[in-house]
Amino acid sequence: MGSTFTGLSGKTKEDFGHGKAKFITYMNVFSNPLANLDMTESVEIDLNQNCVRKGDVFFTTSSETPEEIGMSCVMSENAENLYLNSFCFGYRPTEKFDLNYLAYVLRAKTFRNEMIFLAQGISRYNISKNKVMEIKISLPSFEEQNKVGQYFAHLDHLITLHQRK
């Protein structure tokens, strides 16, 4: 159903804060069901890095509490020269999903409980990429995914509008 990929690797602090490329930050993945392209930072890139694409899913791999492990974020648009931070891993599906559906189902309580169960650690928690890939999610027809995804995207939009008041 897809393959995993790593975030940035082999970087030093001198590579960050400048450069023609951008990367999706840990907080972007942690905070947003759909990647926010305004929450990217500059990085100097070499040839051996993985570009992100529309449809990719990102997961945080480390946190201070089990409840915050494995937060997910979906890349819902195309962007050039964009990469993933080194504290996350990516998943590139080979099947077609409604991206809004995927974004919200991966943050639903049932999926989050699976992630919490997989958290390993005492003062710092980590998660196994291989174990995450074993988790099953409900996949209705694409048409139904689209309806559910649109519903939650609209609901999220209404909540955002209400919070601005």
Language model features: what each stretch is:
Residues 30, 64, 141:
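Flexible, active-site-proximal loop/turn residues at the rims of small-molecule/cofactor binding pockets
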Residues 9-12, 81-87, 119-146:
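A short glycine-rich beta-alpha junction/loop motif
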Residues 11-43:
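DNA target-recognition patches
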Residues 1-9:
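Non-catalytic DNA-recognition/assembly elements of restriction-modification systems
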Residues 25-26, 42-107:
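A short beta-sheet element
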Residues 102, 136-165:
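Amphipathic alpha-helical segments
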